[in-house]
Amino acid sequence: MDRDTAWALLCEHTKTEHLRKHALAVEAVMRHLAPRYDGDVETWGVVGLLHDFDYERDPEGHPQNGRPILEQAGLEGELVHAIQTHGDHLGIPRRTPLEKALYAVDELSGFVIAVALVRPTKRVAEVEPASVRKKMKDKAFARPVHREALLAGAADLGVEFDDLVRDTVVALSGVADRLGLEGTAPA
């Protein structure tokens, strides 16, 4: 499935701007990570873009109830499977770098954006791993984010958490304008 088809599918099932921005953020980070794991940039991007496409319509059944829609739309089986693995509640083991990366960056991308949004400049490029770690200790900040999952995702992917935060910041900086953020740090 190409990106245009994936975007159309996302927009058909996801109407809220917030969830579309989340999809764009995860797509950006997945595209950034793909070459490091010998993954296809387009494929990894499509998986990131579609991973929550069914959440708005069926949060309780997500992501398993979206599976037939993805299959009918022509998404390859291993990519559908990767999307299924990003939900802990299903208990599907994550085995491939694609599956592990999706899990690792799903909540992290949103958390990094939340950290950027509370900065006076709203510049995602200024977010440092230390700032993310500090906000992780504040249980009232971005309350729904599972802190343990942030750390576990990086560990399962085989990277240091701070390095994954840096990669996430770099990737999000490239799409900051589409996310309602400032991109680069001032010169």
What kind of feature is each model-predicted range?
Residues 12-16, 98, 158:
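Active-site oxyanion-binding pockets that recognize sulfate/phosphate
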Residues 124, 130-183:
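C-terminal binding/interaction regions
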Residues 1, 5, 21-25, 61, ...:
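Conserved active-site and cofactor/substrate-binding residues in soluble primary-metabolism enzymes
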Residues 24, 28-33, 42, 160-174, ...:
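Active-site hotspot residues in diverse enzymes, especially metal/ion-binding acidic/histidine motifs
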Residues 1-58:
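Acidic/His-rich, divalent-metal-binding segments that scaffold phosphate/diphosphate chemistry
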Residues 37-142, 151:
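Divalent metal-dependent catalytic cores for phosphoryl transfer on phosphate-bearing substrates
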Residues 7, 11, 24-27, 31, ...:
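Predominant activation on well-ordered alpha-helical scaffold segments within soluble catalytic domains
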